[in-house]
Amino acid sequence: GSVSHMTASILMEAGYKTGLYTSPHLKDFRERIRLNGKMIPKKKIVGFIERHNEFINSLKPSFFEMTVAMAFDFFAEAKTEIAVIETGLGGRLDSTNIITPVLSVITNIGHDHMDLLGDTLQKIACEKAGIIKEKIPVVIGETSPELQDIFISKASESKSEIKFAERNFRCFLDNFDPVAGERGFHIRELNTGRTFIGTIPMGGDCQARNLQTLFQAFQILKNIFKVTDNHIIAGIRNTVRNTGLQGRWQVLGREPLIISDTGHNKEGIEFTIRQILKISRRKLHFVIGFVNDKDLGSVLPLFPADAEYYFAKASVQRALDSEILMNEASKYNLKGRAFPDVKTALDKALSCSSPEDIIFVGGSTFIVAEVV
């Protein structure tokens, strides 16, 4: 999500009429489909359904398939100059994969959607490699020795130029400033020694690898679009303002420090907790909840026992019951109370906190959606 939003923001800074399709949404369905940062108008959604109602009823596409079709229809009608399209899950069989892009980007491989993509990172990598198209360049953001051969093989088979961002760029992040709500970075192009300096409004440590991926992508996109280094730096700095991105290490309060993040797979949660533990504060409070198909055994051991827990249930059908979560968490020495909803859990965390404490809200996108 972050890379998609930053890419769109940069292209907007360069003056292009830019479409952006991402998922899921946090508050409003229309967040998924944006043109120059503005959400699709409600009348366009209604118009699409009315025009295609008969076809939709006969074909019965999935919710995601219908939203992808709606996005493409909207972008075509608006004569969008370029669209940034984020896959839903995997890649090979994803409905976004019907397009032929000018560039494919695979940010990283994590333990996500394992019931659909496969139970090993190798299987997941094979699915994600499915977005590599014939003679279309591809950027790999983060990989490992056991996975890179999968991408190299697929790129070779497709006659596609392949670039590994972490081989060509190195990003260093300054300490996160919760007051300013942003973070300084400098990124070095390894083969030339050139350095780029700027600020990013998303404070997570994971943004270092995202920035490496982004700079690698624009090294290629600069050959297609009129994008300067200044556009890139400004686009990164203005991502939240330009595209409305939320829930990425988002500061919701400062005394106590309240941070929310949508990271929900093992890798994302691990990154987030590691960063939280580096912050010098008195006490930690976690307001967390998960979806009911989450492999709790892979994520609960990542949380520190030396913290207070407020187990919450998001107001969606897929949400895991907070009592069940509390009982499972106790197996990993995570102690706390269960709450029927996110607001009650957060209110309790606030009442139990001092100004020097940290409250983290997360575990699933649905939990974060109720606090941002």
Labelled PLM ranges:
Residues 2-6:
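Hydrophobic positions on the alpha1 helix immediately C-terminal to the Walker A/P-loop
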Residues 13-99, 115-117, 145-146:
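ATP-dependent carboxylate-amine ligase catalytic core
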Residues 21-23, 141-142, 156-177, 200-205, ...:
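Beta-strand->loop->alpha-helix junctions that form or flank phosphate-binding loops
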Residues 24, 70-116, 148-195:
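Extended acidic/charged loop-beta regions that coordinate divalent cations
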Residues 77, 82-87, 95-105, 110-114, ...:
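Nucleotide phosphate-binding/pyrophosphate-handling subdomain across enzymes
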Residues 125-134:
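Membrane-proximal helix-turn-helix segments that form the acceptor-binding/catalytic region
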Residues 144-154, 159-163, 257-260, 266, ...:
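C-terminal helical cap/extension that packs against the catalytic core
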Residues 364:
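Active-site-proximal loop/hinge segments that shape catalytic or ion-binding/gating pockets
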